[in-house]
Regions:
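Short His-centered aromatic/hydrophobic patch
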Residues: 91-97, 116
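A conserved mid-protein helix/loop that constitutes part of the nucleotide-sugar donor-binding site
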Residues: 20-25, 197, 201-220, 237-243
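Aromatic "clamp/platform" in nucleotide-sugar-dependent glycosyltransferases that forms part
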Residues: 260, 279
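Short hydrophobic beta-strand element within catalytic cores of glycosyltransferases
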Residues: 40-41, 296-300, 306
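Donor nucleotide-sugar binding/catalytic pocket of nucleotide-sugar-dependent glycosyltransferases
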Residues: 59, 140-181
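N-terminal strand-loop element at the rim of the active site
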Residues: 2-74, 79, 237-239, 363
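Acidic anion/phosphate-binding donor-loop and adjacent secondary structure
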Residues: 66-71, 154-158, 170-189, 195, ...
Length: 369
């Protein structure tokens, strides 16, 4: 048997974001005797050691914010010239994939995959304009197109959206099965009473996730539901701003900031509702995980309806009226719904990671035949 095909994944870093979580879920479940993952990153990440343990290699170049446009393009060019033995480059950088794949094409790498994980760029006017310029290279530079949802495909690939394939953000379903024992243990660890109403959110502290609105919702809820808590999992540039807002509203004892955690499957057991008021998303892995644990989800109507696993757990709400969210939270909290769901529901929707990994295994092998 020959050596495995080495696929180069391109990301900013391998931290616990949605795209990165999907990549690691794939890596753990793919047939590594046939396919190995290497990574081109710009910064250290929490998954780096696991990648090395699984047999992957990590390459590093400075990101565009560290040296500017021309320095970044030069580094990409030099990297791909020195590493043109790769047969497959799989870029997860949304619009910025244009620069990555253009350099890979010039270096003669035959298979160049653009993967869309979002439906909108972050940043101000200048940043978005620059990203549009970067993204304009994708159509000429990519050979294959993948997306987490139809909306994500239309946003990044435009005219090529119909040529794209959907790669569903699968999860390890057994890990997220509800456990009352785990629920009680986590609540005890967090200092939360058994009979409290617990709202949860998992995501980076950035503009996209709309944490400020989430705090406003909880502030209103607290006025009518005194035994309620909000648990925030994640980190990011806006965390200190949100912490300051929590202090101003005197909610410190009721809002818990947990930072980046590796035990999301356990934390979800402690929640009563999952609240997700994002301005935009591709198709969040964390919402699949929440539904996998039987958790009712109130989410922004800006998020694609493709995220609903048809288990009667998801409700879409507008993000211009906090009172609507409070009313829905109170209504759901009065229901005694079972958290025990059938894994078949996720399986039938195609969100079992074993299916996703099998699809990618065949996809990569087909590319190099």
């Amino acid at each position: 048997m020959g050596s495995p095909i080495r696929v180069l994944h391109v990301v900013v870093n391998m931290n616990r974001g949605g795209a990165e979580t999907l990549i690691m879920n794939l890596y753990r479940n793919i047939d590594r005797s046939k396919i190995q993952f290497d990574f081109l990153t710009c910064k250290e990440g929490v998954f780096d050691q696991e990648i090395l343990n699984l047999g992957g290699k990590i390459h590093r170049i400075p990101y565009i914010t560290d040296g500017g446009h021309f320095h970044y393009i030069k580094n990409l060019k030099q990297f791909f010239k020195a590493n043109n033995h790769y047969k497959i480059v799989h870029s997860h950088m949304d619009k910025m994939s244009g620069f990555v794949l253009k350099s890979a094409k010039k270096a003669g790498i035959p298979v160049r995959i653009a993967h869309s994980h979002n439906t909108q760029s972050e940043g101000g006017f200048a940043a978005k304009l620059y990203k549009e310029y970067a993204g304009s290279n994708i159509e000429k530079a990519a050979t294959h197109y993948l997306a987490c949802s139809n909306l994500a495909a239309k946003w990044l690939f435009k005219n090529k959206a119909k040529s794209s394939k959907l790669l569903k953000n699968g999860i390890d379903m057994e890990k997220f099965t509800f456990s009352k024992k785990t629920r009680e243990k986590i609540r005890e660890e967090l200092g939360i009473e058994k009979d409290s109403l617990v709202l949860g959110h998992v995501g980076r502290f950035n503009h996209q996730k709309n944490h400020a609105f989430l705090i406003d919702i909880f502030n209103e809820l607290k006025k009518v539901e005194s035994k309620s808590y909000l648990v925030l999992v994640g980190d990011g540039t806006l965390r200190s701003d949100i912490e300051e807002k929590v202090k101003r509203l005197r909610l410190e004892e009721k809002v818990k900031f947990l930072g980046v955690r590796s035990d999301i499957n356990r934390l979800l057991q402690a929640f009563d509702l999952f609240i997700f008021p994002s301005f935009h998303e591709g198709l969040p892995v964390t919402l699949i995980e929440a539904q996998g644990s039987g958790l009712p989800c109130l989410i922004s109507e800006n998020i694609t309806h493709e995220v609903d696993m048809k288990m009667d757990l998801v409700k879409f709400l507008p993000i211009n009226n906090k009172n609507v969210w409070v009313e829905e939270i109170r209504e759901i909290s009065t229901k005694d719904g079972s958290r025990n769901i059938s894994n078949q529901a996720l399986y039938q929707q195609g969100y079992d990671i074993k299916n996703t990994a099998h699809f990618m295994n065949d996809f990569y092998l087909e590319m190099v035949r």
